[in-house]
C-alpha cells in the first residue's frame, strides 16, 4: 500500500452502502464519499499543482472529510484552518502555506477575506455538486496517482512555535499507513465499530479517527464542537449512534465528567476508550472506569511530529490517585528511547533516571513546512548511531523507566506545555501577552495540578482588555486562565 486513498477505495468496494461518516446535519456512504472525493479531486486539479497545500477553511463535518479526500485525489495535501481562530493566526498560517487555493463554505468567506487572503477561493459544495464534469477527469486523476509516492505529504497540522509563529508539521502517506495499520490491529478496530470523533480536524487526535474508519470500514460520527457546551447533547449523540470507540483528548473526557454527562446517561455500546494529549488525572480516569468496568482503556503518548502516537499502555490494573500512569511501550516499527544531557542512552535497566524522549522510525514527520531552521533543530541525526545517518525526533519531553520496564512521563525539557490537549509554547503566550497595549512585561507558567496557565505582568489592571486583545491573536486555549 502506497497511498491512504487505498483505504477509502477498498472500503467503498467492501462497504459501499454503509454509512462512512456522519455529523449532526448529514451523512454519506462509502460509495458517496469515494465518488464525491474523486469529483472534487478532478475539479481541484484546475486550480493548483500536485504536492502543493490546499487550505480547508471550515469546521469539521462530512463536507470537510469529502474535501480532504478530494485534495488527496488532486495529488495535494490539506491543512484545516479553524475559522474560529483570530484573524492574526489565520494570516500566519496562510502566509506559511502560500497556498494557491482555499476551500471554504459561504458562511466563512467574510472571515477568510478579512484575513487578507487574495488567492483562489472555492465553495466546497461546488466540488462535487457541479454536474458538468470533464471527459478526461479520470485519466487525469490516474496520471496524478502514478506520480504520487508514499513519501509525499497528506496533511500539515500547525502547532505552537516559541517565536510566536506556528509550525506546520508535515505528515506523509507512508507514516500514516505504518501507524494506522498497527493502531487498528492492536486495539481491534474493525468494520463493526462506530468511532465517536471528538477532536477538531486540525488536531492530530482526529487523524486516528479518520484513517482508522477509512481503513477498517468503520463508521465515523463527528460530534460538533458546540455540543461540548451541553454534555447531554454529546452523550445523546454517542448513545443514539451506538458509538463503540472513543479516541479522545484527556481534556474532553474530564470536561464530560465535570459537567456530569455520564450521570445523565451512560452510552450503552462504548467498549474502547483511548486518551491522549496530556496526563490523565487518576481521579477522572477512575470515574470513567466505574461507568465502563469492562471497556478497554488505553493511555497514548506522542507529539504531532511522530504521526499521532509513539507509545501506548493498555490499562491492566486499578490505579489509586497516588499512582503514576505509565506511558507504556513503543508501537511496532517505532523506536522510542531516552537520551541524557550528554546524549548518552538511558536504558530500561536504569530505572528512575530521567532523559529526553527520542523517536526513530517510519512514522516521523517530513519536517516543518517552509521552516528548515526549526526542522533541523528538532529532527536530528541519532548520536547513538555512528555507522550511518539515522534521523530521530527529539520530543523535548522527559521520561524515565519504571521498575516494571515501562516508560513514565516526567514533564517538559523546555517551556512547552500540554493544555486542553494542545501543545503550547509558553514563550509564545508571553510574546503575545507582552504585545498587549496595556502590558509592559509578562511571564507565564503552567500550574500542572490545576491544569491552568498562570500569567504575571507589569501594566494596567484591566484583565478584560488583556483577554480581548489576546483573543485577537491566539486561540482561546492559549489565553491564560489566571492573571
Question: What are the language-model segments listed below?
Answer:
Residues 1-156, 171-172, 178, 281-286, ...:
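AMP-binding/adenylate-forming domain of the ANL superfamily
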Residues 3-5, 87, 102-115, 119-146, ...:
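AMP-dependent adenylate-forming
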Residues 8-10, 62-81, 183-184, 206-218, ...:
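Hydrophobic alpha-helical segments in the ANL/AMP-binding
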Residues 58-61, 82, 189, 199-203, ...:
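Conserved AMP-binding
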Residues 58-62, 76-94, 106-109, 218-240, ...:
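ATP-dependent adenylate-forming carboxylate-activation enzymes
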Residues 156-169:
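Conserved adenylation A10 loop of the ANL superfamily
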Residues 167-196, 204-244:
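Conserved AMP-binding/adenylation subdomain of ANL enzymes
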Residues 215-218, 243-247, 257-326, 332-335:
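Gly/Ser/Thr-rich phosphate-binding loop
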Amino acid at each position: 500500500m502506497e497511498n491512504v486513498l487505498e483505504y477509502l477505495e477498498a472500503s467503498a468496494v467492501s462497504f459501499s452502502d454503509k454509512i462512512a461518516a456522519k455529523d449532526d446535519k448529514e451523512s454519506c456512504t462509502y460509495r458517496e464519499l469515494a465518488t464525491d472525493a474523486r469529483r472534487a479531486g478532478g475539479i481541484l486539479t484546475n486550480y493548483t499543482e500536485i504536492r502543493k497545500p490546499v487550505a480547508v477553511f471550515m469546521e469539521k463535518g462530512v463536507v470537510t472529510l469529502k474535501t480532504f479526500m478530494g485534495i488527496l485525489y488532486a495529488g495535494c495535501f490539506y491543512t484545516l484552518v479553524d475559522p474560529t481562530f483570530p484573524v492574526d493566526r489565520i494570516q500566519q498560517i496562510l502566509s506559511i502555506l502560500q497556498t494557491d487555493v482555499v476551500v471554504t463554505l459561504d458562511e466563512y468567506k467574510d472571515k477568510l477575506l478579512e484575513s487578507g487572503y487574495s488567492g483562489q477561493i472555492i465553495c466546497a459544495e461546488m466540488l462535487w455538486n457541479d454536474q458538468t464534469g470533464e471527459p478526461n477527469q479520470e485519466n487525469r486523476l490516474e496520471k496524478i496517482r502514478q506520480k504520487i509516492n508514499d513519501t509525499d505529504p497528506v496533511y500539515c497540522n500547525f502547532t505552537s512555535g516559541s517565536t510566536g509563529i506556528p509550525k506546520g508539521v508535515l505528515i506523509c502517506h507512508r507514516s500514516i499507513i505504518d501507524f494506522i495499520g498497527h493502531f487498528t490491529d492492536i486495539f481491534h478496530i474493525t468494520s463493526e465499530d462506530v468511532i465517536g470523533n471528538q477532536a477538531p480536524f486540525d488536531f492530530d487526535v482526529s487523524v486516528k479517527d479518520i484513517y482508522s474508519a477509512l481503513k477498517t470500514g468503520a463508521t465515523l460520527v463527528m460530534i460538533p464542537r458546540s455540543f461540548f457546551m451541553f454534555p447531554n447533547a454529546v452523550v445523546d449523540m454517542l448513545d443514539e449512534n451506538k458509538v463503540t470507540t472513543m479516541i479522545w483528548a484527556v481534556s474532553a473526557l474530564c470536561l464530560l465528567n465535570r459537567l456530569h454527562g455520564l450521570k445523565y446517561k451512560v452510552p450503552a455500546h462504548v467498549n474502547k476508550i483511548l486518551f491522549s494529549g496530556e496526563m490523565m488525572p487518576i481521579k477522572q480516569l477512575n470515574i470513567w472506569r466505574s461507568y465502563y468496568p469492562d471497556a478497554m482503556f488505553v493511555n497514548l503518548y506522542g507529539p504531532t511530529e511522530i504521526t499521532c502516537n509513539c507509545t501506548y499502555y493498555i490499562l491492566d490494573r486499578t490505579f489509586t490517585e497516588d499512582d503514576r500512569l505509565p506511558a507504556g511501550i513503543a508501537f511496532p516499527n517505532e523506536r522510542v528511547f531516552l537520551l541524557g544531557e550528554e546524549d548518552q542512552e538511558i536504558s530500561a535497566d536504569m530505572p528512575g533516571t530521567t532523559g529526553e524522549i527520542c523517536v526513530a522510525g517510519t512514522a516521523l514527520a517530513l519536517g516543518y513546512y517552509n521552516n528548515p531552521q526549526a526542522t533541523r533543530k528538532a529532527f536530528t541525526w541519532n548520536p547513538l548511531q555512528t555507522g550511518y545517518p539515522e534521523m530521530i525526533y527529539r520530543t523535548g519531553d522527559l521520561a524515565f523507566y519504571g521498575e516494571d520496564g515501562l516508560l513514565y512521563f516526567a514533564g517538559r525539557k523546555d517551556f512547552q506545555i500540554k493544555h486542553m490537549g494542545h501543545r503550547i509554547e509558553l514563550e509564545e503566550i508571553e510574546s503575545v501577552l507582552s504585545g498587549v497595549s496595556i502590558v509592559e512585561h509578562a511571564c507565564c507558567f503552567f500550574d500542572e495540578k490545576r491544569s491552568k496557565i498562570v500569567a504575571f505582568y507589569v501594566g494596567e489592571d484591566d484583565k478584560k482588555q488583556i483577554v480581548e486583545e489576546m483573543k485577537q491573536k491566539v486561540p482561546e486555549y492559549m489565553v491564560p486562565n489566571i492573571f
